[in-house]
Every structure is written in structure tokens, then in C-alpha cells.
Amino acid sequence: MGFHAYSSPYDWSRIAGFKATAKTVPGGMIDLSVGSPVDPVPSSVQQALVAGADAPNAHGYPVTAGTADLKAAIDTWFRELRGVDLKSINAAAVPTVGSKEAVALMASLLHLGEGDVVVQPAVSYPTYEIGTQLAGATVVKVDDVTDVDSWVNIPNVKAIWINSPCNPSGEVISADWLTDIVAAARRIGAVVLSDECYALMDWRSVRRNTAASSAPAASAAESNEPASDTAFSLSATPCALNPHVCEGSAAGILVLYSLSKQSNMAGYRTALIAGDYRLVKEMAEYRK
């Protein structure tokens, strides 16, 4: 079927002229546009990259679904940092070449097209909208995706984008709100697309990490966080795959995560999609 033309101008292109003008001002400009990391990549990552370059098959084609070590690392990351046991909720994960391409292709990977509707926040990452238009589907913007009444009765809604912590507002969607969104999406047969690339940048997570290191055996029930928000997670931002949110099943939920923000690795193009086993396995097949 191919890509459809998209009508929304890319935001970074729209502000290019303003950036050029700002750069001529004495002192330069403070660039808050793309959000490219300004701090260096952690030395541990650099060392691992060097070691990986010397691996016996570093020059060969990679495994599409990820190596056994990568799969194990993803499982551990979700379990220890997001409070999610992927296997227990029948979820799978697949690595992607950065998250931007995954976002842009998501509507197409879900076989959406003319007549289908994708809901997204009115103010959000521009690639949500462009990706929907590339698939030929219709974009519907709502002021607040947590207000399920604003979209649940719209005909032909097939997917809902959420972003928590949200860019640019910083708002964190609570576990209760996530539960409502997931339940409403399931009632209408839509997929929840949860962009969680800022999940570990919630400042409240610092307190959680400190508490966990001083009392590693502490249970969720002993913490000051609501029980519905954790299972236990070192991130204070609830995950859409949290068993309390998804009622023990990843069906109809896809979480996108990237190391670009968390580890200053935007140039490394390292990300993943995790969630609904059937959907993720299908996407892994496409990548082959």
C-alpha cells in the first residue's frame, strides 16, 4: 500500500528560521527543541561498545529479535526498574533502531489505514501525528487523553498514544488513570501505545532508589507509594504494563522505550517495543 503523504509540517523544520536568528544574538541561544543530549555517554557504555566491536561475530548481521543476552537484559530491566515481569503478563519485546522510526511506523505496523482513527495528546511529539498520516489513518487530538470520555465514543478509534512523563508538560499519568485508559481502549478494541522514554527521569525516582538501596527487602506495601503504582518499581512513573494497570495481561498494550534520554545515547539508536505478545512477535517477523 505504501506511505501516504503527510500534511503536518515537521516542527523542527518550522522553527529552523527562528533558530538561525537566535544564533545571531550575542551569547547564542538555549536550544530546547529536539532535546539532544548534552552530557557524554556513560564510560561503561563506551567500554562495552569497544568490547562488543571485538566480539567474534561483531561484523555479522544481528539477530532481529535480539541476542539471548539482550533479551535477558530487557527482562531484567523491566522487572527491576519498572516492576513488570514480562512473561507473567504474556508480553514480549523486540529491539528497534531507535524509537523515532518505531513511532513513525507504528500505525503502519498495526495495519491501520483509511477510516481508522488514532487518538493522541493535542500537544505532543510530532512524530505521532506524522506516523498516523503516513499510514493513511486519521489523527484526532484531545487535550487530555486521561479523560477517556473525550475519545472513547469516537467511531473507529484503533489506537491511543499516551506519553508519561509527558513531553513537554512533564505530567505523569497515575496508575489509576492508566488503568482507566487501558480498560476503555479494550472496550472499543483499540491498542494503547505508551511512549515511556522519560520514565526514569521522574525526580521522585531518586528517592525510591535511595530507599531501595538502604532497605532492599522493603516491599511495595511498606513504601509510601500507592500500591497500585508499583509491583515494586524503582521508577516512580507507572508503566502501562504494570500488572495492576493491565490486570495481568499485556493484550492490547505496547510500550516504547529508548536509551536516548536515560543514558544520553541518542546517536546510538537503541530502543525497544514491549507488550502484547502477538503484536510484538508480528513486528519482529516484519523486521526480518
What is each stretch, according to the model?
Residues 213-222, 226-228, 242-288:
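Conserved core segment of the aminotransferase class I/II
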Residues 196:
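Walker B catalytic acidic pair
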Residues 38-43, 168-171, 200-202, 264-266:
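Short catalytic/ligand-binding loop motif for oxyanion handling, primarily in non-cytosolic enzymes
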Residues 192-193:
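Residue-level marker for buried hydrophobic side chains located in beta-strands
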Residues 2-98:
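N-terminal small-domain helix-loop-helix segment of the aminotransferase-like
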Residues 58-184, 199-213, 219, 229-248, ...:
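Conserved core of the PLP fold type I
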